[in-house]
Amino acid sequence: MKKMAILVITLLGACYHSLVMASFTQYSSDEVNFMHRAYLKHKPEITINEVKARLYENQFLLQQAALKTPAIIKRQSAVGFSTQYHVERYLKNLFDSQLAIKAQSSLVKLDTYDSQWLKRTLGPYPKNGQYVQSLIKKMQQIDLTPILYNSINLYEFIDALSMQVRFKLHRGDSELFKSELIKKRQFNIAFSKAKPILAKQGIDIEHLYEIAKGDILRPSIQSWLGINTMMHMQSPVLEKLEKQVNKSEIKAFYQANKSQFKFLSQVKAHGAQFASRANAVDFHTLADNKSLEQALVISGKQDIYAQYNSELNRKNKSSWVVQLAFTTKENTISAVIRTPSGEWVVVHSYEHQFDYFSPEDETVRYQATKAIAKQKAAQQYENNWLKWQNKTGVIL
């Protein structure tokens, strides 16, 4: 078992180093085929060529990140797990599905790491989420290598975990701690077993590390570059491009996409308001059988749009009932609708008239600026991707 630990330490050290390297990697046909089999389980229609293109595009993305936003390579979010943690989960699943490796090993005693040990060792969770040097040094002195089969101390182990998990560990969740230890241990064992099997298949384990990292970081890097949208992630590339959009570009975009700036400018409407839902339902039935205007006369109800002479425009839209008329389908009687004040209304909206925002309107400027910046970001991305292919000699 000691020999296995030394082997894993050596191999993982090489792969950890590969996480920060930005040199070009040529994937073998065996490696592409291996990943094709893996992707097929989630996307049955994917082709070999599509897999090859994805793997190289991911490699291109990693190099873009290394140049422009290197922090994302280590961790996508300050509160999330490290990239290394995600890579290990990705590879463990890959080994399980493609190699059928059983990572069982001799039982390891974890009784030492109980709730009291965690609380005593870690202390209270820091309010700002950042560890002070004294605690870091203390954790660095606790060696987990005998348990995990790779050279790692407690700080390195905990630093890879998410903020939520770390918080629970500081509160003494020993079962969670042991669970994470076992995950790490099982990965390292599976890793040591996978390497010779993969080597016989013509697959470099370091290449799989890069492939895993590329797949994991792909959405975040593309979002950073402005060609993909990811929640809670801003794109400095888009922000810069948006500032460069000028009036002539906005005008040209407006002329080419005028139809998307069409809006409902005016409607005609009649309606009645009731304190009781039952009365509103009765009125709705009457309006269905006659017409809403006739129902107003028969019931003696005042038209809630009388103050506007039943002709409504966007200037009146601050009123809730006016907004309702604009959102009601043309030539239809609405359902019985509860108002914010707790009353009930029934409305009829008709003769909808449309107009176009002017090129100078704030809505046009905002939407056009966003769209133009995205177009430019996509073009930049495509140009850089093609340059990278030409530079590396990749043929897709």
Language-model features, listed with the residues they occupy:
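Positively charged n-region of N-terminal signal peptides that target proteins for export
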Residues: 1-5
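Compact soluble domain cores
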Residues: 302-306
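PPIase-associated folding chaperone regions across multiple families
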Residues: 24-27, 37-52, 56, 63-297, ...
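Boundary at the C-terminal end of the N-terminal hydrophobic targeting segment
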Residues: 20-22
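Sec-dependent N-terminal signal peptides
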Residues: 6-12
